[in-house]
């Protein structure tokens, strides 16, 4: 018999403005402890030294994590020109350098090939698996890691500032699976001067923005208090990119039992993925067909 998780049965999202110097998993564990939650997970890893939006799902909201993971995200980051590191960020060892410094116009021109559908090779120090092992573990052991290129959608890549010849501030909006460190590395290569990420901040992810996030200091200060609960965002915010279809009491009951349930007409078309709601609360996510939602995920929450 499976052991029952200890903790409160709460569902929703807590948007944390992650500090530098912590892993995403450590932040999730801190939030789970502070809220006394029985289940928690994040919607997209940030490197330990990165800051910004870390959206943490609690309880039944963990079923909506894939929709945030798949959503567009935006990053502001500083590229250090003239140096390559083995980790493609400032934490690594400098492995190559150049005295060449591109002009602002050369940098802007070099950004264009990174837009749209591109193929990107992840950093060697990343969580990508190779034959069942994390690439960063192999790289730490001195193995020559070869990673395959992966597709990435880059919606926007802008130059925001050039504070000095060695640094350039960029903003990127991209889809799932993007590595900002790879952008810095490949931009440096395209400019012929090398490059790595100096600082990185995720400013928004799907519907969640860093400026609306709670700090980890606040989480710790409000731990185990009702005040911390007030920062919880509804589970439904994780479904913001899907059409909502309202359902009747009978339809809601059928959906809760895992069966197709009748929904009222809305913006979804036949075959679309959508979510059904009853009295403003999400009941299920599934495929819309002929006036019914065929559930793939059902949200089991108290009435």
UniProtKB/Swiss-Prot annotation:
GO terms for biological process: mRNA pseudouridine synthesis; tRNA pseudouridine synthesis. InterPro entries: PsdUridine_synth_cat_dom_sf, PsdUridine_synth_N, tRNA_psdUridine_synth_TruB, TruB_C. GO terms for molecular function: RNA binding; tRNA pseudouridine(55) synthase activity. Transmembrane segments: none annotated. It holds the Pfam family TruB_C_2. The keyword Transcription does not apply. It catalyses: uridine(55) in tRNA = pseudouridine(55) in tRNA. Its EC number is 5.4.99.25. The active site is at residue 47. Keywords: Isomerase, tRNA processing. Responsible for synthesis of pseudouridine from uracil-55 in the psi GC loop of transfer RNAs. PANTHER family: PSEUDOURIDYLATE SYNTHASE TRUB1, TRNA-PSEUDOURIDINE SYNTHASE. NCBIfam families: TruB. Belongs to the pseudouridine synthase TruB family. Type 1 subfamily. This is tRNA pseudouridine synthase B. It comes from Ruegeria pomeroyi (strain ATCC 700808 / DSM 15171 / DSS-3) (Silicibacter pomeroyi). The gene is truB.
């Amino acid at each position: 018999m499976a052991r029952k998780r200890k903790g409160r049965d709460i569902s929703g999202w807590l948007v944390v403005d992650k500090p530098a110097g912590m892993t995403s998993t450590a932040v999730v564990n801190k939030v789970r402890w502070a809220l006394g939650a029985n289940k928690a997970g994040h919607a997209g890893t940030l490197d330990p030294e990165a800051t910004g939006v870390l959206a943490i799902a609690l309880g039944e909201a963990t079923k909506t994590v894939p929709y945030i993971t798949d959503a567009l995200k935006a990053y502001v980051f500083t590229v250090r020109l003239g140096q390559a590191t083995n980790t493609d960020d400032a934490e690594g060892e400098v492995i190559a350098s150049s005295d060449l410094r591109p002009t602002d116009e050369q940098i802007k021109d070099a950004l264009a090939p990174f837009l749209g559908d591109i193929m990107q090779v992840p950093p060697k120090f990343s969580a990508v698996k190779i034959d069942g092992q994390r690439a960063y573990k192999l790289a730490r052991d001195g193995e020559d890691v070869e990673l395959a290129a992966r597709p990435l959608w880059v919606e926007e890549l802008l130059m925001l500032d050039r504070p000095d010849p060695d640094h350039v501030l960029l903003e990127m909006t991209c889809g799932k699976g993007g590595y900002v460190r790879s952008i810095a590395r490949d931009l440096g290569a395209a400019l012929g001067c090398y490059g790595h990420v100096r600082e990185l901040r995720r400013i928004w992810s799907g519907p969640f923005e860093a400026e609306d996030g709670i700090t980890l200091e606040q989480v710790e200060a409000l731990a185990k208090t009702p005040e911390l609960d007030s920062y919880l965002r509804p589970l439904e915010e994780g479904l913001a990119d899907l059409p909502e279809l309202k359902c009747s009491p009978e339809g809601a009951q059928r959906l809760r039992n895992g069966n197709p349930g009748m929904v009222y007409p809305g913006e979804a078309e036949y075959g679309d993925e959508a979510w059904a709601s009853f009295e403003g609360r999400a009941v299920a996510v599934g495929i819309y067909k002929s006036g019914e939602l065929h559930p793939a995920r059902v949200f089991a929450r108290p009435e």
